[in-house]
Amino acid sequence: MEQNLSKTPIKWRASAIVLAICLVLMVVTSVIGHNIQTSGGTVRTEELTFTTDVGATSHAKLYISETATAETPAPAILLCHGYTASLDAMESNAIELSRRGYVVMALDMYGHGESTLPPDGYKQAEMGNVENYAPDLGSYSALQQFKNYDFIDLTKIGMLGHSMGTAAIQEGAYLAYSKWQAAYTAAYAEALAAGSDETTAAYTAYGAAMNSGIVLPGSMVLTGYNYNVRNINDLTYNGVTAENGVFPLYAAPINICTIQGTYDEFSGLLWGVEDSSQYTTSFKFAYGTGGATNVPSGTYFMYGDASATPLTREEAVTAAASAAVTMKPIRAAYSFNGTHSDTYYDETAIGYGIDFFDITLRGGVATIAPTEQVWHGRAACGLIGLIATLVAFVALALTLLRVPFFSTIVRPAAPSISTVHGAKGVIGYIIPYIIFLLPAPLLYYWLIGYPYYMQPQWFKFLTKFMPNSFFNMAPMNSLMLFNGVVGGVFLVLYLLVFFLIGRKKGANLETTGLKLPFTQILKSLLLAVLSFAGIYAVVYACSALSGTNFSFFKFNIMPMDSTHWVAFFKYLPVWLLFFLLCGVIYNSLTRINNAPAWLNYLLCAVVSCGGLAMMFAYDYGKLFATGVRGIQYIPGTTSPEWLAAVGMSFPTALAGIMLFGLLFILPITAVMSRVLHKKAGSVWLGGFLTAFIVLVFTISHMVISI
């Protein structure tokens, strides 16, 4: 039987020791992570902000190798992350490239991280002067920042993007070459007007364009995204087919490599090929390569060679080096065993990118073999630091609960509704338990939709709660809708169980864990705020001192800027209500009075996300078995009526990726809720604190949509 620890003195020394260990781990992982990030001090990092061509404030991070000097300038590479991420997501690439001597700039895209959205009314001439349209997301202006550093070789510039970032770098490169072409055209016309013949005018114009100060990329790595193929009729991305497409960079001498996971969830949407392992059969691939199709992974070939005749490494090096003269750049195609997001943390994918840059920017010289990678240590530090942070929130709350002012919160916990005896009791418990598992998976994809909304790109996909000036984060709006609807269903189910079953067992308000004097509720709130703020202050300090964050894959708790803090408080009420309700369910219904503590922890963890986990297992299990996900499209978007009205079905890919984070944080906070209920005797402290934690976990890296 689980012991009611709220009746015994709080073991504050144990919680204080755990707190101390967590704080030490947070500091140590930050120090070690910084050492790995800077390659033992041979790479220095700098933060920079700049105003872009459309008036936004962009934030970036430079990684500068000690070998990059004015006397020996180094090649430079711009890294651009995907949607709902920040420049930290590109850290593994930044570490590996910078330790090989490249100067690296990792950029926060518009509305992500510490970069703002452009002010209303901006235009880009190269994009048709369409108001409020800047699809490069700041990548063009970031590219131009390279000319401010004398330790960068401006003839050897690369760009690497992931997903949305891949779309953005293609737009940024297009802007750069369009501006170069405009400078050339103006100088050519001026030379002709001055009496030069066409040959002399062309020579003069070329020199003028090259001296115009426009930084041009010569090498690009596209990961998790297609070639940006436009409709040749209106140069938009609407209605692109195999018959009407054009690749805007077809005339630019840029060597380009594509790297695609064989299980990429977005393949159908982006490439038009459901099985991502077959992405080179896409018409978009053919447009981007000048006609090649069905190209084996690892093949280097010339742009325009429809047969994709393989080049040796030496031939690829020679062709890449002369691309600006011959106007015949190379192409390369790679696949790796992974999903869309795995590109951030996959040795093979990272190695392919390194090797391509070595071939196209360094004449094939590899200072360190592409397979020799050390970013794993930094990733491990991020994960350990993140887990230590999560535990520290609770450890500090339990430690402060010993303080006389807060100790008045503590009271004996009321028994749960659930007591299990015999087979009948087991069945009586299992039935409602299973019922509570069902709403989340049944409603998840339908409620979350495809919450991609990037105002500068004009991409506004299906979401039932579009962002607005108040709730301005599309993914957070979808999660808020999910919390509200599923929370409402949970409330109805709980009330039915409470009044139909619980009341017969003597359940009352005290059973719910909500009965607490108002002053003690306020104290619980204050304790949760102090615990959250105290540990979050350490997160800020560790980030400021080390230049690293507690992040791993899709799991993040990182410092927030003022814009994110404002959003935090706007979304907070819904999170508070949802996690207070969850606390009531975990501790007054899921908890079994006569079960051991470990079993109750497990039951709470499973009920928090078990239904979602089973849906996830089916969805991704089928993906790994067949190459196509089990649940491909959002319910309701595949009917003939929908297709006739909208023209396309919407994939569940983005919602599926968002699910990774939920499956990580929900069971952890369910256990937190159970621990804090055992110690305090009510659900208030746990409800408040877990709401803060889950919200900062989801919002600290979230995109500002408008």
Go through each PLM region and give its residues.
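Membrane-interfacial, low-structure loops and terminal tails that flank and connect transmembrane helices
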Residues: 2-6, 195, 405-424, 504-523, ...
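An N-terminal hydrophobic leader/cap segment in hydrolases
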Residues: 8-51, 59-61
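Alpha-helical transmembrane segments of multi-pass membrane proteins
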Residues: 26-33, 394-398, 440-449
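Soluble extramembrane regions of membrane proteins in the secretory/endomembrane system
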Residues: 42-375
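Juxtamembrane/start-of-transmembrane alpha-helix segments at the extracytoplasmic/lumenal side
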Residues: 372-386
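Juxtamembrane interface at the cytosolic side of transmembrane helices
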Residues: 388-434
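Alpha-helical transmembrane segments of integral membrane proteins
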Residues: 431-706
